[in-house]
Amino acid sequence: MAAVRGLRISVKAEATATTAEPRGPEPEPMEVEEGELETIPVRRSLRELIPDTSRRYENKAGSFITGIDVTSKEAIEKKEQRAKRFHFRAEVNLAQRNVALDRDMMKKAIPKVRLDTIYICGVDEMSTQDIFAYFKEYPPAHIEWLDDTSCNVVWLDEVTATRALINMSSFPDQEKPKGGENNEEKTAEKNKKEKQEESTDDETEEGEVEDENPSDIELDALTQVEEDSLLRNDLRPANKLAKGNKLFMRFATKDDKKELGAARRSQYYMKYGNPNYGGMKGILSNSWKRRYHSRRIHRDVIKKRTLIGDDVGLTPPYKHRHSGLVNVPEEPIEEEEEEEEVQDMDEDDRVVVEYRDDLQPFKQSRDRGAARRSSASASDSDEMDYDLELKMISTPSPKKSMKMTMYADEVESQLKNIRNSMRADSIATSNVKNRIGSKGLSDKVVDVRLLLEEKRQNNNGLRQPNSIVKSDVRQRLGKRPHSPEVKPPSSISAPRREPISDVHSRLGIPKQDVKGLYSDTREKKSGNLWTRLGSAPKTQEKTSDKPENSVASPEEDDSELQRVWGALIKEKGESRQKKSRLDNLPSLQIEISRESSSGSDTES
């Protein structure tokens, strides 16, 4: 059997293993017997075990690599030899000097230094693109945001970062005068040597190169003050302003990291909007952030469902429409912890959110989001798997459709629908009637033609008094049944009825004699002409007082008919002179009701 070994891991809070004194060589393990435990110590620092969660924003325009160490002594000596060979004398530029920087000495003086990274402070009101544009002469690889006022600019090599720091910044103001005096002395000495060399150049032939000692080539050696400042890693002021801001830079260290809760305390996000939460401005609560994360995950699930819906055979329940926000990042955002002490945002991109009505710029932001997804870390892939799992859980199963149906079933379903609709209509009408209340026949608006037809039917059915329908204006308007005429004495108690209104009452002509108009002889007349024309006027009352058994001759009927027609025409002309023709029927009914009500009041 193989020997059983035990693994013992010792983790130190700080990486002090490198600075500790080296121990002697460990003794070789003795032969381990069967069943005996052997301890193997493994030393790791706590920072190595904790993953790096800092967010990096790459330069899409491309980075730059120097390739050779131009700050080394050998490279500077070759440059000077080449310049003397071609008799080239460049102007003295204090910003770009040939400074030989010993990086090994820097690493010893500053153990945690990052020579490929420059720490910059004073970047208020500056975005990521503004910083990339500031270092366009030495394009960096990416940027690490620390807070609103500072960030780390990272290059792919140490040489380019060193060149950018030396050429784009100067020494602090306190040591600047001393350094300036030394530089002036050096420039004066160089000018003297150049004059001496020009006098000796005439003696040398063209194409010949003088044998020079490399040690004689002078470099811009750093003064003791400048060297001490670099070893202390002091902040160096930048040579030019950026958006009115005075920048300071130095080499970054491993301690220059984003603090917890920096995004929550960011004034830049409060002023310009947080692109990680849809460009919302101001202070965002934890509950609102959780709701936003849940909606974001749900939206991503719907997006992926639409992409693979055709392959699986499913269709999305609805389409999601985005808002009019521009520059909103499309990559999934890691959820924050509920405790405020642990809250930290990986997303810290400086993007000014713009609100527009058109969705055309939104497509560009989606393209940028797709490009970012391709360069995302391995943590994003885990979140994608989580979204796919959510999608498979939330996707509904396809609905089963009935394939075999009978015609009788379809007819029955149609009948059920018709019955249900009829019931619903009846219930609706009954509810309306209950709310409005039932109306009698007296409230209905009746047309004049309907009144004439009703009068004709009443005249035809005068012989059956039980079938007479009351059509008085007062009855139609809901007045109390009061008859102004005197009942004739009769032994049989007949039902009281109201007098039928004639043409005169319908045309608005006041009645001349109400009591003498209706007599028993009129009830005996059976001619259709009398029923259509109504009762005769006052001038024809004497002709209507004939005995019941007498039969009028045709000539008398014709003359009487002519007189009636003449009287009607005359009355019609008079009515036209008094008032205009009635165009609106309801107004006619109102006038009649007023006359009838006034007549009933006077008679009563």
Curated annotation (Swiss-Prot):
Location of region: Disordered: 1-36, 168-219, 319-383, 457-604
Highest taxon in the source lineage: Eukaryota
Keywords on record: Cytoplasm, mRNA capping, mRNA processing, mRNA transport, Nucleus, RNA-binding, Transport
Compositionally biased spans, kind Acidic residues: 199-219, 331-349
Protein location: Nucleus; Cytoplasm
GO MF annotation terms: mRNA binding; RNA 7-methylguanosine cap binding; RNA cap binding
Gene Ontology biological process: 7-methylguanosine mRNA capping; mRNA transport
Record field: compositional bias (Polar residues): 458-469
Main localisation: nucleus
Keyword Iron recorded: no
Any one Pfam family match given in the protein's UniProt record, by short name: NCBP3
Transmembrane segments: none
Region forming the signal peptide: none
Residue segments, region RNA recognition motif (RRM) domain: 116-177
Biased composition (Low complexity): 595-604
Chain positions of motif WLDD motif: 145-148
Tagged with keyword Zinc: no
GO cellular component: cytoplasm; nucleus
Family named by the database record: Belongs to the NCBP3 family.
Function: Associates with NCBP1/CBP80 to form an alternative cap-binding complex (CBC) which plays a key role in mRNA export. NCBP3 serves as adapter protein linking the capped RNAs (m7GpppG-capped RNA) to NCBP1/CBP80. Unlike the conventional CBC with NCBP2 which binds both small nuclear RNA (snRNA) and messenger (mRNA) and is involved in their export from the nucleus, the alternative CBC with NCBP3 does not bind snRNA and associates only with mRNA thereby playing a role in only mRNA export.
Subunit structure: Component of an alternative cap-binding complex (CBC) composed of NCBP1/CBP80 and NCBP3.
Protein name: Nuclear cap-binding protein subunit 3
High-level lineage: Eukaryota, Metazoa, Chordata, Craniata, Vertebrata
